[in-house]
Amino acid sequence: MRIDEGFLTPEAIARLQQEEALSDKTHKRTAQQIEAIYSSGQNILVSASAGSGKTFVMVERILDKILRGIPVDRLFISTFTVKAATELIERIEKKLHTAIAETQDYQLKAYLNDQLQALSQADIGTMDAFAQKLVHQHGYVLGISPHFRIIQDKAEQDILKREVFRQVFEDYMSQTDNKAFIQLVQNFSGRRKDSSAFREIVDSIYAFSQSTANPSSWLAEVFLRGSKTYTSFADIPDQAVDTLLACMQDTADQLRDLTDMEGYAQTTKAGKLTAKYTKHLKMIDSLYEWALHFDSLYGKARLGQLAQELTALLPSGADITVAGHKYPIFKSLQEQLVGFRHLETILAYQQESLPLLEVLQAFVISFSEAYLAAKMQENAFEFSDIAHFAIEILQQAPDIRQAYQGHYHEVMVDEYQDNNHMQERLLELLSNGHNRFMVGDIKQSIYRFRQADPQIFNQKFKDYQSNPEHGKLILLKENFRSQSEVLNVTNAVFSRLMDESLGEITYDDKHQLVAGSEAQKQLHPENRAQLLLYNTDQAQEGTEEASTNDGISAGEVTLVAKEIIRLYNEEKVAFEDITLLVSSRTRNDTIFQVFNQYGIPLVADGGQENYLKSVEVMVMLDTLRSINNPLNDYALVALMRSPMFSFDEDQLARISLQSSSQDQPQAFYDKLSNSLRGQGEHPGLIGQELMTKLVDFDRTLSDWRQFAKLHSLYELIWKVFNDRFYFDFVASQPKAEQAQANLYALAIRADQFEQSGYKGLSRFIGMIDKVLETQNDLADVEVERPKHAVNLMTIHKSKGLEFHYVFILNCDKRFAMADLQAPIILNRDEGIGIKYVANVKELLRDEKLASLKVTMETLPYQLNKQQLRLATLSEQMRLLYVAMTRAEKKVYLVGKASKEKIQAKTADNSSEGRLALASRERLLSFQDWLLAITATFSKEDLFIDVRFVDDSDLTAEAVGQLRSSGLLQADDLKDNRQTEDIARALDMLDKVSKLNASYQAAIELPTVRTPSQLKTLYEPLMDTDGVDIIDQPYHRPKSFDLPDFSKKKAVEPSQIGSSLHELMQRIPMSDQVTAGDIEQALQFVSADAEVKARIDIKKVTSFFATTELGQLLQEHHQCLHREAPFAMLKKDSLSQEQYVVRGIIDGYLLFEDRIVLFDYKTDHYQHSAELKQRYQQQMDLYAEALSQSYGIARIEKYLVLMGGSQLEVVRLDE
């Protein structure tokens, strides 16, 4: 290729596509990729599905431009992140090196070397970076010094912002006519007594405006648009009415389906329609009729009347119960009716809110101007300021704009679906109108919280699709990442979920994923997608699994651990090929705990700025706060409750009752001091154990406070670590390496704080508290990531990455919809909608009431809320798409649910192969969507298996263990700081172990033994003649088997034995024990039904009815002692040390001249002689204890044997 060779014509591109298709290349470029690489002369939008090779296309296109004589510095290339820009530059650099090596043309080599040198100076990076460069060069147009700095510390931003707010607020409050402003502040203050709630409102409006192309224009022209437009029923948009009517029809459809269910009683025994069925039929008919004939029956003007009639028609509750299951079919419609029901009243009072909104508009504009002025004075700006400056420069200076437009051959942008309107305006100004190249995928737009607007992409998609003269639309559908099992399930799910109404694009043939190679099309049935649900039916009430908690349960994580162990053991999958995806990087401790339990290495990509919220750092900060000021109740109690001192709730409650006076409240530290002196109101509550802990705590805290006066913060923190072993303690917890790094960093940051000239604990605490007050944090401490570990990251963090096996966890977590209840809701096109606090006193006509305040959702608020709800659900849908398309081989979706309820679930309504819009809007979790799809559509077409996992599947035995991967290596502790006390303790242990050898016999002798233990001890130590050979060592067998905590397991003989003993204890003894007495006693035995069923009641009855011993017990029941505890001293023959034997005797009859001792045994046996020999020593011990206690030498000993085929009572002293 010559440097000056022209760009390919459409005909040349078509020939190249044909040649590529006929070539024998292993990795062929698709026709669409070739078109995207070589097309030119107009704006181009590339809609690139997941895994379709968009980065490859961009790199090839850039290289083609360079090879055709376009220097790299004449290309504007925007990426979403700095990391993406770095990777793109590295790929271009590699391609250029390859091109240089392959060509023999010295002129081309020289040119390509020049491009390599120019690459570092080319405009390849984020929009923020380019805007800074432009303002540095041309900021003089706006009077901005080129020496400005960026305020990157959010804490600094917030401090400055608060100060500006305070000044503007005081200005408005000091005005003579401030009545409307005061009412405005009160409208948003709620129960707060300060202006903080109003400040949060202003902050949110300011932040939102900054994402627009022109903030001041948006505030002036759009901010009040909705409030001035939507003032009557006639102004309600058709879409809002259509949504209500669709919800009515969907409710009718669901109700009709429920009435057709098998468990629904349509008729009485006499064959007549039940009253419930008649009522429901009326509901169904009315809902259908009112929805279908809305225009003729009501129209917008009578929408309030429809809402009231619907309210009267529907039940007050949201559920209908069929066959014991509740179905919340009315919930969605009732939520829709809340606003419409009282809309006439709301519209009347809404007029009062407009003057307040005009004041709010003026205040936000004043604040924005004052905040910018303050930043100008500091010559320090935020990224958004710089971007707006860049836009303003290009708009105000045509010569500068034309220079950029003439310079750039092409304006390229990656991840176009995540652009906001400010960025879009900047790109428009840099382009000459027909040289834009935009790559993105609206299905992966997941940054709405950063004010990204996927509609920018969508509008261009539709425009280019309908009007090719405006630009070329290229679809990259082929996926080169995932196997067919992943592609098929993704297509099956989203073709039934995503459309223009919800998802903001219709998932049809244009967007469905297609396997890009033959290898991907090969079927692997073992990799079929799975929806794994932990069955909460068996979870005990009150447990995490049984609750409606959205958090990740231990059951969910255990089933994931089980599958990972299977993959590792059986399929030899490496840990690093497995990734867990979660919606949030917080509250994931359960995952670490369970993985720790099973030895599965796990590394979390935790993101940034979560440091001060880590538990170990919060504990240390509260420790420092307590040292600085022990009168800080919250910090002091947190310190006492922490693992350093471990005071429990009961102990803290006892201390809290030790006030010295009921008249004045006292700090918790004063109550602690009262407790120590015994001067509290209830000194009797402070026991000796608690007093000992209090003395230790008070002495330690006093020591720390004294130490803090004379030493640095660094030394103080390490003293706390050493005194209470806290640094060593966190090493035993989940995420130990990260926790220790955080604590070490706290000491380092405290040292840096003092090195910078600030001194003192008080100032350090003040600095930390100021950071926290502004809801900011410090950057997390990075630790070295293990190479071979399962990955844990958020879905947002995973975007652009790929993994062999993906587990999407916590699919049952409800979507975050808190923004729908906020005091204000902003819309880019309609402006603000608010909740207005109206005084409705005149409606009640009650002169006694001074005022009656009611919070109303104004019509603009309701309309914005509906738009926000759809936007939120659409983004959640795209999040699920991103998560599922990260998988190369297999995707697992994991959640928890009641199996019984899910199996009783009816199919949802569908339309044109998708779930009905009302159904999709009603469902509020990934799991809800997936289960609705599987219940509604043929399972064969969904390419996913739904499997419930019970507790019985998650026992330690069922989960299994990781296969051994060779010898374990010693931990590398060279970088850990070991406390001095630990070092001394290790030395002491080494010396003590040598001393122990000299007194081994006495050391190993237990202070207390039970008869059963002694029986086990005696058996190997006594020969047939009873000769003592106890000097031979006895080794107790050790077991390292994992305990089995499953619910369903086989009944153990020990359980039967324990339950039988309890039964014999509970039977009421009298002259005649009946079968009824025994059955009644069995009801009170604390055992499972399975265990009770194994007790042989016939043998128990026979014992009392047919045996001499049983008759004797009934005849002399007044002499009977049951479950009698005893204790006696014995001497060890080897060490000559005494020890205590303790035990419980099943029963004995106490007579004046003798004792009849008996014991129940359930051991299985063939000959009774076996058990006589086995239990002889144990019964002798019982007899010896009774003889010592009562001074009676004659002891008759009986074993009641119930483990054989027949009941037997044998006497041991015969």
UniProtKB/Swiss-Prot annotation:
<dbReference type="GO" id="GO:0043138">
    <property type="term" value="F:3'-5' DNA helicase activity"/>
</dbReference>
<dbReference type="Pfam" id="PF00580">
    <property type="entry name" value="UvrD-helicase"/>
</dbReference>
<comment type="similarity">
    <text>Belongs to the helicase family. AddA subfamily.</text>
</comment>
<keyword id="KW-0269">Exonuclease</keyword>
<dbReference type="InterPro" id="IPR014016">
    <property type="entry name" value="UvrD-like_ATP-bd"/>
</dbReference>
<comment type="subunit">
    <text>Heterodimer of AddA and AddB/RexB.</text>
</comment>
<dbReference type="InterPro" id="IPR011604">
    <property type="entry name" value="PDDEXK-like_dom_sf"/>
</dbReference>
<keyword id="KW-0227">DNA damage</keyword>
<keyword id="KW-0234">DNA repair</keyword>
<dbReference type="GO" id="GO:0016887">
    <property type="term" value="F:ATP hydrolysis activity"/>
</dbReference>
<dbReference type="GO" id="GO:0003690">
    <property type="term" value="F:double-stranded DNA binding"/>
</dbReference>
<comment type="function">
    <text>The heterodimer acts as both an ATP-dependent DNA helicase and an ATP-dependent, dual-direction single-stranded exonuclease. Recognizes the chi site generating a DNA molecule suitable for the initiation of homologous recombination. The AddA nuclease domain is required for chi fragment generation; this subunit has the helicase and 3' -&gt; 5' nuclease activities.</text>
</comment>
<feature type="domain" description="UvrD-like helicase C-terminal">
    <location>
        <begin position="512"/>
        <end position="800"/>
    </location>
</feature>
<dbReference type="GO" id="GO:0005829">
    <property type="term" value="C:cytosol"/>
</dbReference>
<dbReference type="Pfam" id="PF13361">
    <property type="entry name" value="UvrD_C"/>
</dbReference>
<dbReference type="GO" id="GO:0000724">
    <property type="term" value="P:double-strand break repair via homologous recombination"/>
</dbReference>
<dbReference type="GO" id="GO:0005524">
    <property type="term" value="F:ATP binding"/>
</dbReference>
<keyword id="KW-0067">ATP-binding</keyword>
<keyword id="KW-0413">Isomerase</keyword>
<dbReference type="GO" id="GO:0033202">
    <property type="term" value="C:DNA helicase complex"/>
</dbReference>
<feature type="binding site">
    <location>
        <begin position="48"/>
        <end position="55"/>
    </location>
    <ligand>
        <name>ATP</name>
    </ligand>
</feature>
<keyword id="KW-0547">Nucleotide-binding</keyword>
<keyword id="KW-0378">Hydrolase</keyword>
<dbReference type="InterPro" id="IPR038726">
    <property type="entry name" value="PDDEXK_AddAB-type"/>
</dbReference>
<protein>
    <recommendedName>
        <fullName>ATP-dependent helicase/nuclease subunit A</fullName>
        <ecNumber>3.1.-.-</ecNumber>
        <ecNumber>5.6.2.4</ecNumber>
    </recommendedName>
</protein>
<dbReference type="InterPro" id="IPR000212">
    <property type="entry name" value="DNA_helicase_UvrD/REP"/>
</dbReference>
<keyword id="KW-0238">DNA-binding</keyword>
<dbReference type="GO" id="GO:0008408">
    <property type="term" value="F:3'-5' exonuclease activity"/>
</dbReference>
<dbReference type="InterPro" id="IPR014017">
    <property type="entry name" value="DNA_helicase_UvrD-like_C"/>
</dbReference>
<dbReference type="InterPro" id="IPR011335">
    <property type="entry name" value="Restrct_endonuc-II-like"/>
</dbReference>
<feature type="domain" description="UvrD-like helicase ATP-binding">
    <location>
        <begin position="27"/>
        <end position="483"/>
    </location>
</feature>
<dbReference type="InterPro" id="IPR027417">
    <property type="entry name" value="P-loop_NTPase"/>
</dbReference>
<dbReference type="InterPro" id="IPR014152">
    <property type="entry name" value="AddA"/>
</dbReference>
<keyword id="KW-0540">Nuclease</keyword>
<keyword id="KW-0347">Helicase</keyword>
<dbReference type="Pfam" id="PF12705">
    <property type="entry name" value="PDDEXK_1"/>
</dbReference>
